Amino acid sequence: ICGHAGLITNDLKIKDEIKTGIWFTDFYINKKYRSFGYGKLLTQAWMKICPIQVTLCNDASLKIFKKLDWSSNNKFLRKLEIFNYLNLIPIFKNNNISNVIKENLKIKEINNQTVSNIANESEKLLSQKSFGVVRDENWFKWRVLECPYKKNMLIFNYEGIDIITNLKVKYNFKILNIIYTSRPINLNLTKVFSSFIRKNKINFISYISKNEKILNVSLPWSKKLNFAFNSSDSTIKDSINEDFND
């Protein structure tokens, strides 16, 4: 085995039409085979599956994609915020999750009804856009109910905003990863959400946001992401570059 690749199919709404694209999720070539051009061959095989391809990738993968006429931008950032400096010290750690949260922030049960309600709201919001990722009921069932890490998920609602999160433990630190919000998180929500994180002694909160920095520089707590994409249709390619923001 010299390498492997993974992908997920996902419908996209582009100029009010539903198109199927593939999201490249995993791309690896064994170091001793990287000079043989296998990365390029693997990507070319990938590209035959579907005419629209998108991914978030590292610099090494981006070099391969660009050789095949892909486009890219850095409009997204992976952000990591520290919320419990004291809890970084092992003696102060607490692994219990408390349901004591501010009145307007609610934890919802993870079941079919919750997922169905979130999906309905997502489809309503998408109907108001000319471009976006199609997240219907099947998408949310796959992403939440069928997820192998379902037991680590928490779904919040704050004044009508749904927030799907995954609680991970890495190097003995608790990280709350935000994987979906129905609408942008405003400052007030950030404050309320932070209160829950502090009460439960979660060390970090991780999320992807728009890159609004003037200088395109990565920092330990704010890493620029390579968003790469390709399509045989140049108008679709332009639309992804201009309108893809969720």
Language-model features: where?
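Amide-forming acyltransferase catalytic core, primarily the GNAT-like/NAT-type
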Residues: 1, 6, 71-179
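Beta-sheet entry/capping signal
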Residues: 4, 21, 51-54, 204
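A broadly used, surface-exposed interaction patch
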Residues: 4-26
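Active-site/acyl-donor-binding loops of N-acyltransferases
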Residues: 9, 53-103, 163-246
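Conserved acetyl-CoA binding element of GNAT-fold acetyltransferases
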Residues: 18-31, 172-184
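Conserved acetyl-CoA-binding loop-helix of GNAT-fold acetyltransferases
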Residues: 26-49, 185-197
